[in-house]
UniProtKB/Swiss-Prot annotation:
GO BP terms: endoplasmic reticulum to Golgi vesicle-mediated transport; establishment of Golgi localization; intra-Golgi vesicle-mediated transport; intracellular protein transport; organelle transport along microtubule; protein secretion
UniProt name for this protein: Coatomer subunit gamma-1
Similarity-based family: Belongs to the COPG family.
Basic and acidic residues biased stretches: 1-11
HEAT repeat feature ranges: 64-101, 283-320, 322-355, 356-392
TM ranges: none
Function: The coatomer is a cytosolic protein complex that binds to dilysine motifs and reversibly associates with Golgi non-clathrin-coated vesicles, which further mediate biosynthetic protein transport from the ER, via the Golgi up to the trans Golgi network. Coatomer complex is required for budding from Golgi membranes, and is essential for the retrograde Golgi-to-ER transport of dilysine-tagged proteins.
Chain intervals for the UniProt region annotation (Interaction with ZNF289/ARFGAP2): 609-874
Amino acid sequence: MLKKFDKKDEESGGGSNPFQHLEKSAVLQEARVFNETPINPRKCAHILTKILYLINQGEHLGTTEATEAFFAMTKLFQSNDPTLRRMCYLTIKEMSCIAEDVIIVTSSLTKDMTGKEDNYRGPAVRALCQITDSTMLQAIERYMKQAIVDKVPSVSSSALVSSLHLLKCSFDVVKRWVNEAQEAASSDNIMVQYHALGLLYHVRKNDRLAVNKMISKVTRHGLKSPFAYCMMIRVASKQLEEEDGSRDSPLFDFIESCLRNKHEMVVYEAASAIVNLPGCSAKELAPAVSVLQLFCSSPKAALRYAAVRTLNKVAMKHPSAVTACNLDLENLVTDSNRSIATLAITTLLKTGSESSIDRLMKQISSFMSEISDEFKVVVVQAISALCQKYPRKHAVLMNFLFTMLREEGGFEYKRAIVDCIISIIEENSESKETGLSHLCEFIEDCEFTVLATRILHLLGQEGPKTTNPSKYIRFIYNRVVLEHEEVRAGAVSALAKFGAQNEEMLPSILVLLKRCVMDDDNEVRDRATFYLNVLEQKQKALNAGYILNGLTVSIPGLERALQQYTLEPSEKPFDLKSVPLATAPMAEQRTESTPITAVKQPEKVAATRQEIFQEQLAAVPEFRGLGPLFKSSPEPVALTESETEYVIRCTKHTFTNHMVFQFDCTNTLNDQTLENVTVQMEPTEAYEVLCYVPARSLPYNQPGTCYTLVALPKEDPTAVACTFSCMMKFTVKDCDPTTGETDDEGYEDEYVLEDLEVTVADHIQKVMKLNFEAAWDEVGDEFEKEETFTLSTIKTLEEAVGNIVKFLGMHPCERSDKVPDNKNTHTLLLAGVFRGGHDILVRSRLLLLDTVTMQVTARSLEELPVDIILASVG
């Protein structure tokens, strides 16, 4: 027998594993003992244990050596030792996919399966099913049916679970065992009933009606097994989600009835299912919340944890539904289990009132040092949500966050705090200077490069706009002196932004940048030299274009375009307009941040959605002369209902002088194949349809794509808004649903689709301008135009802002899409690029009286984009 080690030895790992230095060849040599007579059960069981250990440690056994060991092991069936026999069953299962001719043990296993020794029968069933393939299954079908309804629970469960595994390869055979499985489902044994219902569900899961009947039967007659109840609750909730059924459904009634079950496991499963159902109202959640409230006072820690974690999830969407539990949650704040206490606190932060925040913060402070970073992040996220809910409490919450920031913690924890502080600074102008000062202190002793560079970027963006910007320069320049190259480069960029926006500080900034020109690192030197030359010109347009706003292109797209340019040498200079525009700010384009300690491997730049479309369209001969793709619509437009015989979705692709409409078509009729599918389009305005690219064949349920190429208006270039009537034309060929063979002859048919709208937003790509005022000055007023409009149907500033942003398809800058409370005036700042690469900026001043009055001022370097904006708004 193996030496018995106590738990302490096991945890210390000090030589407690007797199999640690096993060699495969030595173990296989030992396996020859299996051929000896008489059989030594104890020794053979020990060798089988070694073989199993090697396999489970990932040791590779060759087919020949595995087969030899397997055949030797079959001789051990001559022994009646129960331990050795069980080890044989385990070895058969593990070696069934390594050794050859494993079916040699079929007769021995069948004998054990039908024998009188109950301890052998269950494991024999499992081992037999492991080595049986679909061709042999019918030979043991009779034995399997008998085993399923066996009076011994272990045998019945083994047969049911094995049947479940066999479903994957022999569904039609196992389906014939349904009657036996139904008989087993009425067993008094909880595991047999659970496994039987599991098998029945997997046989019927593609038949929605049959599954509903199963649940109805369970509702009427009940079950003895709590495990079976839990499974049926999950099945019912899945059915509800798929059907998008109403809460009056019998399925929902069944789940709700399980809240009154005598087993805590079932009650929690039902409550969890109701909470996770999409679109549940507070009223429908009430019974589940009541049950979870009772669990909060349970003496069992596992139940308390489950309850408070689930209530935490409810509080995210329905905080009012959890308010009734606040007293119970407050009692859990002092729970000895810190995980429970943390979840209770974060739930209270989501449901508590403004007056309770100070008290909650004190309670959190008392145990923050005792919980893991993972739970600290949860607390920070809850505080972040609270800041948005109660902006007047930002001072209390900020102080708490700064205290946490000074404490020890990992990268994810510190990043969560920094994210939260930055969001408070952006949302609440009163907290800006306090927040920036504390972040300056943090980077003095910050070990994480990602956080230091992010804070430096924020200081460069927000610092120059404060009342005393010079106080931040010392902190930024300290980074140039004390940090490594990545942080130094970030600090140089931040310094340049101060110089670009503050003429008084410019001489001092130039002195500091001249010192940076002598840096050891290329990146730092290059940045310093570049910024120095730009700032010395003392031109606002240059500052805006090269320092404050920078490039608005996709970083991965730029990298790919430059790589392509170097691979194909050309006398023409690199054209920046050939690079796709960024659909997100530069900071958001970067890959997931990692701590500086992590070793970064070179990564292949992933293609963006627009680049994928660019490649697909370039492969179509008719589109090769269109130039670079300017924009693709963010979401496809559905031109049919999802339940109709043909499902058509359209993606709009905009080029400089053309538009391509991509129609993704799916044929949902299994007795038809469509050929030469096109979508004919009739414009209402001056657009001109140039050609159609058909989808050659559209078999059943296989998506296909056809295209329509349209020229943009030339006579009246401002008439960009247009409605197209669409009709799908195709040739129908009948086909056999079973074989898929189509008829040779077909007939022409057509199908009317929904109208398709083209709006001004399809011609503008949104871009982020970090400093709108600088960008506004950079564009200049040569083509500035201004008009005033009355929005008679709009009654609030928030609605007006939302509609304008959506209609124009431009990016709101400097958080101007957020309308302050109790204001009747607001200025919305929008930035974009018109097709062809022309910057377009819009400043919209809004006044709310009885209705909303809007004064729109547009600027661009070309006249056409300005005219289009004003024409579309009018």
